[in-house]
């Protein structure tokens, strides 16, 4: 790889030229990394709902043409000025949010919301000089959440790159750079269920199942899955879910159903849908005195959370979380080690594998609600 250091690399990338239209495989030029940047060779990437959401461009600022993608794994090809903790050949996970290690958030043991590198979905350029590292015929192609992994090579700020165990299989651990870590950490780091406790998981997609996996790892004895789609229930058993509730089967609010099932409420709940009614139910279904509800899903911008203040006065706790409270550079390597030590199973999240040339099929699968994670193999 040393022959490419300092040179523009021409490679394949799946470019989103406009909202909702199939990605187009293009030859793009990828400039060398600048100060505090690294250029990565992406080996595996997967598709997350966030990619689809911004590809559809419903309700946010459309930024096109753009290279999407943010769940991935690869190898460092070269590093820019000032980069000291990464070197060519390192195995890494690029992450959509960062850890500069200098701001108040990064120095805090409680926060992972880096002031410098926190996710920015509107920015399509690099922080260093306000320019894109991607171009076609000299015209810029914009970045996505600082990662743009639907390209054979990409340039990322060093603070958004987690160096991992080189023995870890990149085609498995690539899913840890977004959704799976988000759900897992929501349980392990924020809800913190104790051994033998009860946990309700709202939404049994990939993030919700990762939250269930976290509850299972923590030793919860009852994990109640709540979803409007009963076809998800059988699969969820693999992730430790012991009981299921479909709100459509009841005439009363689901929080009342869960309270009756659990003698007053669950010890913990994790909400992964982003629907405001589910968020309220997730809070109101936890037990008074000690119950903790954790919100993961992102609601509609005009949604309003309404609950009676007595629900707080009766000592229920409501928390929110971002990326499972994991600091990308400090913590994600440890999550990879959980997988390597067989504490965490990733294979059951991976339901499809496709070659890079068929990336649009991955979008079709997600739009149909088929499967959890589709791994896209970049090599021919």
From Swiss-Prot:
MF terms in GO: alcohol dehydrogenase (NAD+) activity; S-(hydroxymethyl)glutathione dehydrogenase [NAD(P)+] activity; zinc ion binding
Keywords from the UniProt entry: Cytoplasm, Metal-binding, NAD, Oxidoreductase, Zinc
Coiled coil region boundaries: none
Subcellular location(s) per record: Cytoplasm
Catalytic reactions on record: a primary alcohol + NAD(+) = an aldehyde + NADH + H(+); a secondary alcohol + NAD(+) = a ketone + NADH + H(+)
Cofactor entry: Zn(2+)
This enzyme's EC code(s): 1.1.1.1
Protein name: Alcohol dehydrogenase 2
Organism: Solanum lycopersicum (Tomato)
Gene transcribed to yield this protein: ADH2
